[in-house]
Amino acid sequence: MRHTMELTMVGTGSAFSKKFYNNSALVEFSNGYRLLIDCGHSVPKGLHALGFPLDSLDGILITHTHADHIGGLEEVALYNKFVLGGRKIDLLVPNTLVESLWENSLKGGLRYPDEGSPEPELSDYFTVRSLKTSSYGVAHTQIEENMAVRLYPTVHVSHMDSYAVGLVDRGEDKVFYSSDTIFDEYLIDYALTYSWVFHDCQFFTGGVHASLDELLSYISEEDQSRVFLMHYGDNMEDFFTKAGMMRFALQGRTYIL
């Protein structure tokens, strides 16, 4: 068993990026479990480009139901069913999202049964693992031995449940992964209790993501050295030297943590 976690940025782009794949990370825990965080419509292509076939995944965790975070799930479901002989991987879903993920997003393309079979459900394609959530703070779920995730509610868009993720490996708070959130001082305080922080950013203030200026103004220079920026626009290179001690997470790069 390895004693390190590896995180590969499959995609680092914003929802409207044409230069980068949808923001997504492939995390390999020290026990060997490979967890994909979010699976937007361009993520299966991004995995292929990096040499990770879909059958190399053990599970997928969904943080919210925007298309750039779930749009590739239909492809994964159908590929596992028809190409991989019905293989089912874990689908880790916050308990507040399980129903809407199927009824409002995936059912339209996956509801059609085989001849003579009943109409399928989400559990016919994935091993659905409902994750605990809390409206007011952190919720902890043990996934396997020496492996756990924590969910933190975020404010992203009105009336949509969304979550940041804390990754715990061998009892160590390794990575805080913001997914999508507006600037939130309290959330950043939680984030900085982890060894490493991967935080979404945009290059203007206002809107539905934390801005680079807001992050720079709040996070100390010492802590900035532990922060990687992700979910950015195609003009990222214009800001490459304007991020203080923070670094931009690079698409295709594997980080040993």
Swiss-Prot record:
One Gene Ontology term from the biological process aspect of the record: symbiont-mediated suppression of host innate immune response
Residues that span the membrane, as ranges: none
One Pfam family hit: Anti-Pycsar_Apyc1
Catalytic activity: 3',5'-cyclic CMP + H2O = CMP + H(+); 3',5'-cyclic UMP + H2O = UMP + H(+)
Binding site for Zn(2+) 1: D68, H69, D180, H231
Entry cofactors: Zn(2+)
Cofactor notes: Coordinates 2 Zn(2+) ions. One protomer coordinates the metal ions and the opposing protomer provides the catalytic residues required for cCMP hydrolysis.
InterPro entries xref list: Anti-Pycsar_Apyc1 (IPR056308), Metallo-B-lactamas (IPR001279), RibonucZ/Hydroxyglut_hydro (IPR036866)
SUPFAM superfamilies: Metallo-hydrolase/oxidoreductase
Stored Gene3D superfamilies: Ribonuclease Z/Hydroxyacylglutathione hydrolase-like (3.60.15.10)
Residues holding Zn(2+) 2: H64, H66, H156
Keyword Metal-binding appears in the UniProt entry: yes
Region (Beta-lactamase-like): 21-231
Keywords: Host-virus interaction, Hydrolase, Inhibition of host innate immune response by virus, Metal-binding, Viral immunoevasion, Zinc
Origin: domain of life: Viruses
MF terms in GO: 3'-tRNA processing endoribonuclease activity; metal ion binding
Keyword Metal-binding recorded: yes
Subunit architecture: Homodimer.
Membership in a protein family: Belongs to the anti-Pycsar protein Apyc1 family.
Function: Counteracts the host Pycsar antiviral defense system. Phosphodiesterase that enables metal-dependent hydrolysis of host cyclic nucleotide Pycsar defense signals such as cCMP and cUMP.
The protein, known as: Anti-Pycsar protein Apyc1
Organism the protein comes from: Bacillus phage 010DV004
Gene: 152
